[in-house]
């Protein structure tokens, strides 16, 4: 459960992302594909080279979903229900991949905002991304 302080930290961190959200989403995906090559199996029809239009487009989808989640921290299941259905029933993404992408997103945020990435902010973002991952995998059961 996210505390009021966690929610404030997440909102402040995401506000600093600003107009770079789609780029950070794409960068996090690129990090995920490079660090965990098995994640590429879900994108056989994509050009997965760094900077590809398809990776950028999917990075924007990731960023848009996270922006929606940041704005709906009090109702993540409601905000992410359709996305959970999609990943569980149609795409059948292995739930571990959400944790891998979350880790790469944390690395991306830390790389771009090192001064703002305090231990408290890191912990809050980690809890938030874990909550998002839990919601996205909730329809698997």
UniProtKB/Swiss-Prot annotation:
GO terms for biological process: hydrogen peroxide catabolic process. Heterotetramer of two alpha chains and two beta chains. GO terms for molecular function: haptoglobin binding; heme binding; iron ion binding; organic acid binding; oxygen binding; oxygen carrier activity; peroxidase activity. The modification Phosphotyrosine is found at residue 24. O2 binds at residue 58. Red blood cells. The modification Phosphoserine is found at residues 3, 35, 49, 102, 124, 131, 138. The modification N6-acetyllysine is found at residue 16. The modification N6-succinyllysine is found at residues 7, 11, 16, 40. InterPro entries: Globin, Globin-like_sf, Globin/Proto, Hemoglobin_a-typ, Hemoglobin_oxygen_transport, Hemoglobin_pi. This is Hemoglobin subunit alpha. It comes from Suncus murinus (Asian house shrew). PROSITE patterns: GLOBIN. It holds the Pfam family Globin. The modification Phosphothreonine is found at residues 108, 134, 137.
